Each structure stands twice: as C-alpha cells, then as structure tokens.
From Swiss-Prot:
EC id: 1.21.3.1
Site positions for Transition state stabilizer: F213
One MF annotation (Gene Ontology) recorded for this entry: iron ion binding
Effect recorded for H64L: Reduces the catalytic activity
Source organism phylogeny: Eukaryota, Fungi, Dikarya, Ascomycota, Pezizomycotina
Protein name: Isopenicillin N synthase
InterPro entries on file: DIOX_N, IPNS-like_FE2OG_OXY, IPNS-like_sf, Isopenicillin-N_synth_CS, Oxoglu/Fe-dep_dioxygenase_dom
Positions contributing to 2-oxoglutarate binding: R281
Record's catalysed reaction(s): N-[(5S)-5-amino-5-carboxypentanoyl]-L-cysteinyl-D-valine + O2 = isopenicillin N + 2 H2O
SUPFAM superfamilies reported for this sequence: Clavaminate synthase-like
Ranges where the Fe2OG dioxygenase domain occurs: 182-290
Known outcome of mutating H137L: Reduces the catalytic activity
PANTHER family, per database record: 2-OXOGLUTARATE (2OG) AND FE(II)-DEPENDENT OXYGENASE SUPERFAMILY PROTEIN (PTHR10209:SF867), OXIDOREDUCTASE, 2OG-FE II OXYGENASE FAMILY PROTEIN (PTHR10209)
GO BP terms: penicillin biosynthetic process
C-alpha cells in the first residue's frame, strides 16, 4: 500500500501592496485577510511585496557555493568555535560531516556598530556582524545589508497590517520596531543535496515522517520567509499535519510566540516542522524582533469591545529582550543547535 497523501494547508496569497500606500479602506481589506489567515492555519504568502527575490536567491546561492570550509570556521559562532566568545547569534552555523547537513549564515542589525550604545554596554543579543573577506566575496556585505533593510521595510508594512487587523493604530508595532534598535535577524540557510545523506542528520517524527527540523514555534514577533520552490514545511492543524505549498514568488509569513503571548493566543504561533528533502534548496527567514527594552502589554482582542483594550489578566508583560533570550535558549534545548 502507498503512503496516505498529506492534505494541503490553506495558505492564502495576500497582496500587501496597499500597506505601503495611503488608502485606508484598502489597508483594512488587507488587514481582514491577514486576520483570517492568522486565525486559520497561521500562514499566508505576501505577494506584490516589492522585494527582488531572484536577486536575493542568486546572491545567496553565489555565497553558499563559494565559501570555503576555512572561511566558515573563521566566521563560526561560539557554539562551534569557542574562540569566538562574542558571537552568540551572528556568524556561521557549521555543518558537521556525517552528523549535520544544514548550514547557515546569520547576521543582525547593520546599525550595531562598535560605537552603538548597546554594543558598548554591552547588552545580550546585540552583536557586531562578522563578514567574509570582501576580496573573496565582492559585494556580499553590501547585498546582505541592503536586503536587511529591504525586508525590514516590507516587515514594517506587514506589521501595520497586523496592527489594523487587531483594531490598533497602524504604528502599534512599528513604534517598537526601529532601525537603530531592532533585534531582527536574517538567516541564510542552505539545505544541501548529499549522496549519501548522513542518517544521523535525519530525524523521525512520532508519525514516521522524516524531518530536517522538528516541530517548533518561531521565536519572533512575526517571521518573513523566502524559500526555494521545494515543498518542505508542514503545519499542525486540528485535522493533523498539513503540507504548506512552496512559492518562491512570495514571502511566507506567520506569527511567532511573542505575538501569541501579547494577543492571548488570539493570533497563535503555528506549530510547524521541516520535512527532510534531499534537494539543494534555500530557506531565508527574517525573524522580526523588537528592541531590547520594548514591552507590549498583553491583551485579549477577542473580548475587547467598543475600543476597550483590556489587559489579559493571566499574561504578564515581558520585555522583548527577556523573551528573546529565553525563547532562543529553549529552542536550542528542545531541537538542538542549528
């Protein structure tokens, strides 16, 4: 008997271009679509977003295919290279031959220069980015920093849509998501094709599905993901696991667990997982994070009436820095070092 086909999740394509404009009614129409998606499977594709995705994929592929093992070691985060004491988040996440196939390069806010107040203090979760040699990778840093601000701009527009969807002012989220303080990160993940593929790099779920990364909720306010046109993601629904169709023309967007916390799970963080697929592909998430001290008081949108924004009585306010530290630590403890 053949395997039972997995249902396809409802993941709508939403035209987000009105969120860059001034037409309030069109913005509210987008907000209603975001609201419906957020309370269904929790995912939607943002289209007409204004970001050059072929350029993003092409430049990322050029970097992934040209960086050497020695360069990866020189850029490695502390979890892999103990000499790099200050690199907790930013840097290269190494593959381990025979054990771990996925590899990635993470970079943070380009505003975090050596004279930034949070770097000088220093404050956890803030790091100065490390970059490969410009002579060996000409233009890579310029590309990466430009992409950061391109996707930051898109994310700001989408956050305006989320704010309207929740009955808030448009700047409800963006006032906490500022260029000089945001802890948002870009991760350029490579899933390679390998022959043979190392068995220890393949995990098996309780239902027998082979996985590259086990179930989890994202540690973010929202996540804005570009991925290759290779189906790999699954979302957990009341009807069971469902496939999220791949679409390399849009950004796949979902709420993270901070959004779930502050909305009292009105917008939950969808539980999802990454299937094992032995095919060369990219997964390039932008984890949208607020600033270190930014704190949003939780409330229950479902019970707010007549403009009232009642606090969720059993949900304490958590600063974003505290949330991010604990969330990333918990994810590593659960699923291992990426």
């Amino acid at each position: 008997m053949g395997s039972v086909p997995v249902p396809v999740a409802n993941v709508p394509r939403i035209d987000v271009s009105p969120l860059f404009g001034d037409d309030k009614e069109k913005k509210l129409e987008v907000a209603r679509a975001i609201d419906a998606a957020s309370r269904d499977t929790g995912f939607f594709y943002a289209v007409n977003h204004g970001v050059d995705l072929p350029w993003l994929s092409r430049e990322t592929n050029k970097f992934h295919m040209s960086i050497t093992d020695e360069e990866k070691w020189q850029l490695a985060i502390r979890a892999y290279n103990k000499e790099h004491e200050s690199q907790i988040r930013a840097g290269y996440y190494l593959p381990i031959p025979g054990k771990k196939a996925v590899e990635s390069f993470c970079y943070l806010n380009p505003s975090f220069s050596p004279d930034h107040p949070r770097i000088k203090e220093p404050t956890p979760m803030h790091e100065v980015n490390v970059w490969p040699d410009e002579a060996k990778h000409p233009g890579f840093r310029a590309f990466a920093e430009k992409y950061y601000w391109d996707v930051f701009g898109l994310s700001s527009a989408v956050l305006r849509g989320y704010a309207l969807a929740l009955g808030r002012d448009e700047d409800f989220f963006t006032r906490h998501s500022r260029r000089d303080t945001t802890l948002s990160s870009v991760v350029l993940i490579r899933y390679p094709y390998l022959d043979p593929y190392p068995e220890p790099a393949i995990k098996t779920a309780d239902d027998g599905t082979k996985l590259s990364f086990e179930w989890h909720e994202d540690v973010s306010l929202i996540t804005v993901l570009y991925q290759s046109d290779v189906q790999n993601l699954q979302v957990k629904t009341p009807q069971g696991w469902q496939d999220i169709q791949a679409d390399d023309t849009g950004f796949l967007i979902n709420c993270g667990s901070y959004m779930a916390h502050i909305t009292d799970d009105y917008y939950p963080a969808p539980i999802h997982r990454v299937k094992w697929v032995n095919e060369e592909r990219q997964s390039l998430p932008f984890f949208v994070n607020l600033g270190w001290e930014d704190t949003i008081q939780p409330w229950d949108p479902a019970t707010a009436k007549d403009g009232a924004k009642d606090a969720a009585k059993d949900k304490p306010a958590i600063s974003y820095g505290e949330y991010l530290q604990g969330g990333l630590r918990g994810l590593i403890n659960k699923n291992g070092q990426t």
